[in-house]
UniProtKB/Swiss-Prot annotation:
GO molecular function (one): ATP binding
Organism in which the protein naturally occurs: Clostridium botulinum (strain 657 / Type Ba4)
Gene name in the database record: hisG
InterPro entries assigned to the protein according to its UniProt record, in alphabetical order: ATP_PRibTrfase_cat (IPR013820), ATP_PRibTrfase_CS (IPR018198), ATP_PRibTrfase_HisG (IPR001348), ATP_PRibTrfase_HisG_short (IPR024893)
The record's note on its domains: Lacks the C-terminal regulatory region which is replaced by HisZ.
Protein's recorded name: ATP phosphoribosyltransferase
Length: 211
């Protein structure tokens, strides 16, 4: 049985992924009692798995370059970049959406001034407004994008919305929904050939429990 290396996004997706792993009998003991460890042996009679925790934006890189055979990461991260791997499964967890949000008085389709849009996801925002044939100025920021319209940096924001509580608490509202997003499983292209049986087993077993 060949070893399969899995790169998992730290944080919220990590906890939900553990539940899925347990459901298909992957050994998660080390992962649940991890301390400061970053690499975990999840081997048992059914699987030979090594798992490591990384930041969301790094999951794709580990998978693309073959340091990981499989990755679990949000669709938001996949949409923002352009890397080479197979996207094989929608895990139906970590569900939220991309949306345009602004102060209630803002109208996206009114006025002739070029709109300023603050976002952590410039590529996603650019493509969205391109399809709407709107010429906007994108302002990339890494912190709380909700501040943009409040302090006058931007007219609106493009960001991930889960419950909408953060928007409401800061006096903002969703103007338009862009798309639904969720966690996805990605696979290194070479691994799909060299470790096909092991990878397909994991994909199929997870597919069964998330239906």
């Amino acid at each position: 049985m060949k070893k399969v290396k899995i790169a998992l996004t730290k944080g919220r997706l990590e906890k939900k992924a553990i539940e899925i792993f347990k459901a298909i009998n992957i050994n998660t003991r080390e992962l649940e009692d991890k301390g400061r460890k970053l690499i975990f042996n999840c081997e048992n009679e059914e699987y030979n798995i090594e798992l490591f925790l990384v930041k969301a934006k790094d999951v794709e890189t580990y998978v693309e370059y073959g340091a990981a055979d499989i990755g679990i990461v949000g669709k938001d991260t996949l949409m923002e970049t352009d890397k080479e791997f197979y996207e094989v499964l929608d895990l139906n967890m970590g569900k939220c959406k991309f949306a345009v949000a602004a102060l209630p008085s803002f109208k996206l389709d009114q006025g002739y001034n070029r709109k300023k849009i603050a976002t952590k996801y410039p590529n996603i925002a650019r493509e969205y407004f391109r399809k709407k044939c709107m010429d906007v100025e994108l302002i990339k920021i890494e912190g709380s994008v909700e501040l943009g319209p409040i302090v006058g940096l931007a007219d609106a924001i493009v960001d991930i919305v889960e419950t909408g509580n953060t928007l409401r608490e800061n006096g903002l509202a969703v103007v338009e929904d862009i798309c639904e997003i969720s966690a996805r499983m990605i696979v290194n292209k070479a691994s799909m050939k060299t470790k096909k049986d092991e990878v397909i087993k994991i994909v199929e077993n997870i597919s069964e429990v998330i239906r």
